[in-house]
Curated annotation (Swiss-Prot):
Binding site for L-isoleucyl-5'-AMP: 552
Cofactor note: Binds 1 zinc ion per subunit.
Lineage of the organism: Bacteria, Bacillati, Bacillota, Bacilli, Bacillales
Top EC class, one word: ligase
Record's GO cellular component terms: cytosol
CDD domains: Anticodon_Ia_Ile_BEm, IleRS_core
NCBIfam families the record matches: ileS (TIGR00392)
Protein name: Isoleucine--tRNA ligase
The gene coding this protein: ileS
Amino acid sequence: MEYKNTLLMPKTEFPMRGNLPKREPAMQEKWAEMNIYEKVQEHTKGRPLFVLHDGPPYANGDIHMGHALNKVLKDFIVRYKSMTGFSAPYVPGWDTHGLPIEQALTNKGVKRKEMTVAEFRKLCAEYAYEQVERQREQFKRLGVRADWDNPYITLEPAYEAQQIKVFGDMAKKGYIYKGQKPVYWSPTSESALAEAEIEYQDKKSASIYVAFPVKDGKNVLEGDEKYIIWTTTPWTLPANLGISVHPELEYSIVKVNDEKYIIASELFETVAKTLEWENAEVVKTVKGSELEYTVAKHPFYDRDSLVMLGDHVTTDAGTGCVHTAPGHGEDDFVVGKKYGLEVLCPVDDKGVLTNEAPGFEGLFYDKANKPITEKLEEVGALLKLTFITHSYPHDWRTKKPIIFRATAQWFASIEAFRKELIEAVAETKWVPAWGETRLHNMVRDRGDWCISRQRAWGVPIPVFYAENGDPIITDETINHVADLFREHGSNVWFEREAKDLLPEGFTHPGSPNGEFRKETDIMDVWFDSGSSHQAVLEEREDLQRPADLYLEGSDQYRGWFNSSLSTAVAVTGKAPYKGVLSHGFVLDGEGRKMSKSIGNIVVPKKIMDQLGGDILRLWVSSVDYQSDVRISDDILKQVAEVYRKIRNTFRFLLGNLDDFKPSENAVAVAELREVDRYMLVKLNDLITKVKEAYETYDFAAVYHAIHNFCTIDLSSFYLDFAKDILYIEGANHEDRRAIQTVLYDVLVALTKLVTPILPHTADEVWPYIPGVTEESVQLTDMPEAVQLYDAEALKTKWDAFMTLRDDVLKALEVARNEKVIGKSLNASITLYPTAEMKAMLESISEDLKQLFIVSEYKLGGMMEEAPADAPKYEHTAVVVAQATGETCERCWVVSETIGKDAEHETLCERCATVVKENYVK
């Protein structure tokens, strides 16, 4: 007889190798055929809603690792919620207007100057749709389950119509106004920019100290002094109309040789050192408030520079006397307005100085720095010129520096509802908690929102102008434009004349001749995506406002979190979200930002082609995503190894359940041995821990709990000793069926627990599980932890056993290294335990050979009675010797019972019995 044929070895067709790059696309096709998204919605119908609202990625180019991190995190949450009593629809979106699409077309050779705006916009729309399609396929490849056939896209007519309504509601409440004001201006884009469209980069700039002679001292100054200002933007000096000082600061009049200078007293030493003053003496001090309305002379133009008070003046740098150009700075503008100064802005859309800057007209602003500095030197006003490298705002798209420039723009008045915004921030749950402080401070400190852009590709600002220049925004015009956009799309604005966009028979007192013109500016793209709570959450039947969660990168505090909050509070008085969760950026393995120049860009597609989507998803679950995260080949290799262990666990479980029918073979919990019940306690602990971690979005805790359970609880302990029973005993032996009962519970629970993170693998495992009826594991619920009546006692006892087992394993390892034994089945062990361990060992003595995977086990005396040379550990002393007897051909246990059965001379007594009872006819 071939005894190896009598062993019940694992048997399964579940493949050992994942081969995910090939197998996942096939699984996704299967999901598409069975309409998995709709099936899940149907399955969860009638449950309470959980809405995670997708912040729309920008439709341009392939998805990057930041996109992958974001979408996969969202997918974890939505999948988990749909398995825990919620209906969790997920509608993906795309942001499709804006400059990058215009630039992409120009780069492709589109001659936009040779076509109408409407024609150019049609090309923009076509390009945007192509990009949506490209990204949609890449997101699907990640295994993200979403309503991919019905996304929201910001260029779609229904969306644009709702955006117009949001604008109209805000205008009706008086929150929209037109004003001349300095805004971030990009000369390279020739447009205003929102705060969210700028990024800071290092820039080399001139740093100059300039003297402004006093013209009228107002009886506070004698008239022979000079104010010193410091600036890094010499090109703004032609626009200088004043000098700001702080009312509470003390200022010194400092005599240096024959000159007298005015600076903040606190900065005396710094300025003296920088300007290399020797023998400088303070002849007088005055309070900043006393200097108000004194007048200085502009250094090279024949005009006054008024001295004003401003709280924005600090002593962090400079002189405490701040050059003030109301056309080129927010603080300058506010102070200038208070003192009635004009808003002088001698720079055009392209960043070129105009004839309002005599002597420098026609120069690009950056090129004007040198001649202006030379002019200052010529007139004796330049006290010092150096160069510094400092952090300076740049256009996030063109990567070129931007300027502050006063222009006529449309604004949303944040000031009008700032109090409500701050309250809404306080009512929202923020994860991480610092998000609340971050957005609170932004909302508290931000100026009004410049919502107009001087571009072609976007949603038009729905304003008309009467003959007398009055802007027209009424309920009637807004509703009519919204209806037109819903029917024809926003291109209709560029295809028709103003009168054809107005309601029929529309009149206005400012247009006695019935003539009107339309606004040519478009809305900031942040107004587009910021209106999604109205256009998507409110409009779609399967969603609701407020959403339960917004989840985006930490750059969205100033972006989508902010713009959505502003429009929602303006329109509804409430935040559009109940909770906000943010994640960090993806860096390379060394913690560097990914960039083409370094050549360290990791692309999701490459990972999926080489390793698979589930490996990428497992990486997402492994990182502390609330901070910046790292990815590299080495990191992915480690993750792939963890995946291999999880997959092998599934394969082992399936292999040992091949002959198990739950309905026929399952053993009642009360009839299980203690060690089996202990395993169920460990499983229930895992279920509790993993579900709590999912609830708090702590996916790294899920990852570690599942990995540890597979490697420590299962592989290193339960499955290791169970092999002796699973393979060796007869198919229906009660201990074997008991272990299979536990393995079955473990398999079903583990498959469900990993589903949100490893959906492809979970759905690959699912049909192999005996007795399952559901088409997909996604149509099931998370396992419930079952509290065993003796769970605490089992845990106390068996946790203690596990620590003692560690001592035994160490002793066996030492014996192996000293060549006392080969493998552990060659060993006979005698334990000399502590008093508390002795009673525990006596209660489970019959299982101990199997639990320690040795051939012979004896209980000696107490620990103090152990032989002097026996290794002593925390809980026991252990004597390891070679087991006596011969090795059984079938189970490899060393036994003195070999050959006792004459028919089976090479088998131990146990194996001979099993063979006779199960295999001998």
